[in-house]
């Protein structure tokens, strides 16, 4: 019996049950601890979607990883302005996931939604390419850049993001079934979905890794050529995606589920005093028994379970605020460090993707199966806690690293004065302002963030998919992805201070915030992995 079916039959009798049981069902789906339960093969249809996402991520990272240096050197923006624009782009890329979920659920279904937003995305990449031509710099440079980012690429990627990972996971058979060649062994749906999300996340990073390796090198020749490559790769991805249409299972649209959800929550809150005593306030939506409401008891019960699960997402905006430093502030730091002539400041993020690509198969094929055989359960909540802890340690390291960069000659903290208060001359070109500290000292930061992603980000995607009933999956996935938008808002606020000599304090504040959030998250949710 699935968690959704169990949820339909569950009767809550006290406040304690109402707090624990909905989440208990989510964790039951997320953790399987038996030697007789194994993951099944990933269907070919799911692989086509995963390959499409690889191409999309090549395009996204291949273009976006250039933005900071492009704005600083070509569009001549300050570090603070460039960071604010970058975080604004990230905000729109993730807040638009909600719109993408509505379009898929109400009108088009996931396949058509992904395809249409992919075309808009490609048009944005074309405009970005044209606006970066040197001869158009003064007229179209900044306006074309902003329009392509905020009106086209961000909407395109947002519409895709809210649907593509869920679409891949929905290609998995919905029920457990016996292994065809191993008697007594069961192909488990939950573990198979977990595998899909890990390989989906690995594809994201293979695409990102290739984009980060290729486009920065090409940008040395011409910006427009560097931006053209992501556009071409994404066209290839769209073709691959379209060719798989006959093989896809595409859940038909069932109306505006997000709108129905909001109306149900509002009605439940207004009628919370009419619910059965001892039940959650959402059960107020069941107060009318005359069939006049647009939802039934099952929808309300599913919504309650989803509501409890979504509490887990509350800390993610802080995590994403730290994570997004890779796209801007880490590049700001790298620009001012010594590095080989062949290495561009943003290319070190290649290491982040490489770590994920290497570690995910190791965890999937070796580590997690051994843990299951040993009877050790590493549930989703504990995996997320591990990810949060690692990124906290990463930013402690980055804070110390920035401190040493400011202590290094010849330009120290880039304010025009040395530690003795004597005036020093700062070159006009930001790329000429380099202190005696190697860019390779950034390697631990990229490695740590990569490992944290496997535990926090990939698990978050998986948890979001499992925490919702079928009709709410796109809504919940979009809400999880929207946490990145709120992380970008935090980054936009921090961008006010994201100029030299303030970066030590900016990094330290983020490390402290993430440490506090990790402690609170563990205190509030760690028990959920142990309640079954």
Language-model region placement:
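Hydrophobic transmembrane alpha-helices of multi-pass solute transporters/permeases
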Residues: 2-9, 14-178, 188-532
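Membrane-interface alpha-helices at helix entry/exit sites of multi-pass transporters
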Residues: 180-183
